[in-house]
Amino acid sequence: MWEKMETKTIVYDLDTSGGLMEQIQALLAPPKTDEAEKRSRKPEKEPRRSGRATNHDSCDSCKEGGDLLCCDHCPAAFHLQCCNPPLSEEMLPPGEWMCHRCTVRRKKREQKKELGHVNGLVDKSGKRTTSPSSDTDLLDRSASKTELKAIAHARILERRASRPGTPTSSASTETPTSEQNDVDEDIIDVDEEPVAAEPDYVQPQLRRPFELLIAAAMERNPTQFQLPNELTCTTALPGSSKRRRKEETTGKNVKKTQHELDHNGLVPLPVKVCFTCNRSCRVAPLIQCDYCPLLFHMDCLEPPLTAMPLGRWMCPNHIEHVVLNQKNMTLSNRCQVFDRFQDTVSQHVVKVDFLNRIHKKHPPNRRVLQSVKRRSLKVPDAIKSQYQFPPPLIAPAAIRDGELICNGIPEESQMHLLNSEHLATQAEQQEWLCSVVALQCSILKHLSAKQMPSHWDSEQTEKADIKPVIVTDSSVTTSLQTADKTPTPSHYPLSCPSGISTQNSLSCSPPHQSPALEDIGCSSCAEKSKKTPCGTANGPVNTEVKANGPHLYSSPTDSTDPRRLPGANTPLPGLSHRQGWPRPLTPPAAGGLQNHTVGIIVKTENATGPSSCPQRSLVPVPSLPPSIPSSCASIENTSTLQRKTVQSQIGPPLTDSRPLGSPPNATRVLTPPQAAGDGILATTANQRFSSPAPSSDGKVSPGTLSIGSALTVPSFPANSTAMVDLTNSLRAFMDVNGEIEINMLDEKLIKFLALQRIHQLFPSRVQPSPGSVGTHQLASGGHHIEVQRKEVQARAVFYPLLGLGGAVNMCYRTLYIGTGADMDVCLTNYGHCNYVSGKHACIFYDENTKHYELLNYSEHGTTVDNVLYSCDFSEKTPPTPPSSIVAKVQSVIRRRRHQKQDEEPSEEAAMMSSQAQGPQRRPCNCKASSSSLIGGSGAGWEGTALLHHGSYIKLGCLQFVFSITEFATKQPKGDASLLQDGVLAEKLSLKPHQGPVLRSNSVP
């Protein structure tokens, strides 16, 4: 029925393929958009590649960056040294490289496929994983229950380790969990092992519980040890990095909070304002606090910020800034404090806590807050004693135009040095003179026996008269000595130059005088010259007249009678035992004696002061009588030799010819007190030591020639042939006649005298040729010292102030002071003091501070610039008291020692002391030791004293001045006027061994 009702379609035999309707519709159709096609089009899923597209930026083992080796099958990356095993650049494979974990997994897959083919389980082995139930069924057949538990536990560990790092995981690799286990994927493939196929293989593998863990560790990539999350710090401290959100990392547009809409800090309505200035972000960008809702401008903070903070930032309204701002606080303490103040604190809680603390009557633990004390220094007891017992102040030294002004006449405190108790005794004088005479005679006999011809001796016996003429200097005041210890009634002013030696005084002795008497008288004169100055700087000193002491004469010198003394008006009987004989000014070795003092060269400030170059007069001396013993007569034979060696070192002192009653005038010191031989000026040397011109008859007086020329003659060694010939020729002609004929002199002698005269006229321009005269070596020890001083430049000079002894140059970095013979400055040469030690002090130069310092060694102390430096005699307390047992033992020992001392007979205990034991000590100017000024505690200052130019140093009662040459050699501004007066010539004429001028602006 239905078939009948179906209509039949009419089929037309038309060709519709060639119609134009489709083309017409295509032309009339509206344009199509591509969006619909894109939406409808499904993205074609790319096939998964075997390796990862990106690898980690840090090493999976040490979590550090650098040159990394990337795995081609997983995102792991390693350093060459972090691989397992470590690799080198030469060991890198040319193709793909797989890490240790991927290599183990690949081997396991290959083993699984091979086992599947053997057992006919190829389909099962092709699957990646099997269900846990199937594994359990297989294990039930071959393993026990304990083995199943171990496998289940291993599977749980495997899943925990492989969760964050699986290829299908969408978690970011930057999370803390992924940093720990980022590439762990299927570490233990228990599911993939064909357990059923090899039941015997599984059973021994699970015998021990740690075997499975060891197997899992062998299959993992090497990693460094890391603490678990439970032990790491998770507190968000200020300054830590912020964790970015997923939307920020992916770049997707996510709805943000109102105050974070703009990246530049611009916040739209509702407006957010700054907490400090209440202005919006239109003024400047706002900074949001990460711990509270407050915002701030960068310029409103204190101190202002220069850039936006990168990490977590905490605003200044938090109390954590005060609590966490401690230097010695550990991380755990910071975390505890931060967690404590993280929540808001109720104001009522603060009030209640305050009230509870106030109303507590008996608090369990009351802590008394100690007041903060100011930092203070403990003043040493030595400094306290200096203020309690201050030493006497130094007399103010007058300083004018940068020059030190002092008084020429000694003070009352120094007058004791001129008393007779400090002079040598008669026995000492006789012993000294006898030893000097014996030494000189032995030297002369030795030289004469070797090289002196015999005809000189024959000629000496034929000659009888000796008429030496001595050039005297009226500027030096000396005295006469008498044999019976009584002064002569008449007084004569006698002037003796420093060149007169002991032989000249001996030659004037009377014929009937005994040798012993002569020795005693002459030795007393020589010793007096050591102990007392021949003349003071600004005038004579009124001293006590004794038998062998100095005697002053006031009569003018207008007579030249050979029977009289120089300048005498009253004739003296030649054979009388009371006749006075001229006292020698200095002994031959006076330059090296300890207490000898020569006159100080000074520049007086009065225009009408005494002249330093007085006129000279010729004083004849009686001839030597034939009754003089040979020991004394032989001394005169060495007069020429001693004039050359001794007189060249002894300078004539200058004295003031004013009367004793005249008031002392202040003088400006130009040179310090020098030893014998210092203080010869160039201006006076040309007048005093020049050889006189010959007379009309061609004769020259021998005394004038020997004294005037021998002062600057360069010395020769004692065994030199030229020296012996010169000595013999001069002695022969001087002993025979009173005058010398130039025609009779030797040619070598004439050349020598001419050369000596040239040296006097041109001392600095003309140098003697070494081949013409001989080697210019020095005969005396003092001259050798002078040569050494020329070679080594002095750093500083140590000057005495009491007028005794000479200045000592500090040529090296240290200068030792004391009474010992090995000291650089022997204090016995500068006077007597009972409170000085053998090694008293040391002056040294510190290379680091570039200063001179003095270190005291003596128990008596040293005063530097009115500050006492001494030893610390205070009792030192032990740092810790002894224990009870030790104290008991010590008390028993002490008691036993006292019992032994009581039983033994009392004896005087020997004590070491720097003071001399035995005879009574000589008095000195010290009232007591300087250590008595320390105080009751006995704590002296043992530090070093800083020395400046002009520092005043006092050792007992001996006073010195320390002068630095680099300051002393600087000339002041007022030297331009001194050039006109000729004073500069005197300064430049100082000898090299003379100390520099005490003149500087830094004198304290």
Swiss-Prot record:
Compartment list:
Nucleus
Q: Which UniProt keywords apply?
A: Isopeptide bond, Metal-binding, Nucleus, Phosphoprotein, Repeat, Repressor, Transcription, Transcription regulation, Ubl conjugation, Zinc, Zinc-finger
Q: Where is this cross-link: Glycyl lysine isopeptide (Lys-Gly) (interchain with G-Cter in SUMO2)?
A: 467, 900, 973, 987, 991
For the region PBR, give the residue spans: 105-128
Every FHA domain range: 815-869
- Binding positions (Zn(2+) 1): 59, 61-62, 79, 82
Q: Region Interaction with SIN3A: list its residue ranges.
A: 102-273, 300-704
Q: Which GO terms describe its cellular component?
A: nucleoplasm; nucleus; Sin3-type complex; transcription repressor complex
Q: Which SUPFAM superfamilies match?
A: FYVE/PHD zinc finger, SMAD/FHA domain
Q: Which GO terms describe its biological process?
A: negative regulation of DNA-templated transcription; negative regulation of transcription by RNA polymerase II
Binding of Zn(2+) 3, residues: 274, 277, 297, 300
Annotated Zn(2+) 2 binding sites: 289, 292, 315, 318
SIN3 interacting domain 1: where is this region? 202-241
Task: State where composition is biased (Basic and acidic residues).
Answer: 32-59
Compositional bias ranges of the Low complexity kind? 166-179, 908-917
Q: In this chain, where does the modification Phosphothreonine occur?
A: 557, 570, 671
- A molecular-function term among this protein's GO annotations: transcription corepressor binding
Provide the function of this protein.
Transcriptional repressor acting as key scaffolding subunit of SIN3 complexes which contributes to complex assembly by contacting each core subunit domain, stabilizes the complex and constitutes the substrate receptor by recruiting the H3 histone tail. SIN3 complexes are composed of a SIN3 scaffold subunit, one catalytic core (HDAC1 or HDAC2) and 2 chromatin targeting modules. SIN3B complex represses transcription and counteracts the histone acetyltransferase activity of EP300 through the recognition H3K27ac marks by PHF12 and the activity of the histone deacetylase HDAC2.
Q: What does the UniProt entry state concerning the protein's domains? A: In the context of the SIN3B complex, the PHD-type 1 Zinc finger delivers the H3 substrate to the HDAC active site. The atypical PHD-type 2 Zinc finger has a structural role raher than a substrate recruitment role, wedged betweem SIN3B amd the HDAC and stabilizing the SIN3B:HDAC2 interaction. Also interacts with SIN3B through the SIN3 interacting domain 2 (SID2). Interacts with MORF4L1 through PHD-type 1 in a SIN3 interacting domain 1 (SID1)-dependent manner. The polybasic region (PBR) is responsive to the binding to phosphoinositides (PtdInsPs).
Quaternary structure and interacting proteins, as annotated: Component of SIN3 complexes. Interacts with SIN3A in a complex composed of HDAC1, SAP30 and SIN3A. Component of the SIN3B complex, which includes SIN3B, HDAC2 or HDAC1, PHF12 and MORF4L1; interacts directly with all subunits. Interacts with TLE5.
- Name it: PHD finger protein 12
Source species taxonomy: Eukaryota, Metazoa, Chordata, Craniata, Vertebrata
